Amino acid sequence: MANKVEDLVNVILDSYKECDMTARIDEERMLNRDILIEIIDEIRKVLFPGFFDNNKVRSEYLKFLVGERLEFIQYHLKKQVSNAFANQDVCRECSKAQAEEKAEEVVFEFLKKIPKIREYLNTDIQAAYDGDPAAYSTDEIIFCYPG
């Protein structure tokens, strides 16, 4: 049985060489899908406090909570953007430090836009509610849109 498994391992390893588009061996990691999903979840919680949280959001802890979430988003998104830059033409000739610096700038510019994004969302939510006769509340719009 051990030889069969070893033979299979060798066949799979050969396939990594032959099908190199589907393997990234000894290369910097590109993007981490699981981390990106966590980042999106945290951004959604910042955009809609109290809607997608597991626990009640208390006003006395809101400043701490928002700060903690922004720190998480900034740290992890910076790493993901930096990895993307390192693997794209945007920053292919950059050093790792330059890619990280550029990523930090891009991420902070995005984070600075959160208040404006919230304004747009507020307007969009009201418009969706006004245009949907089946909607019972703006909360329903937030939970159900898009699809």
Task: State each model region's role.
Residues 1-146:
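Terminal amphipathic alpha-helical/low-complexity segments used for targeting or macromolecular assembly
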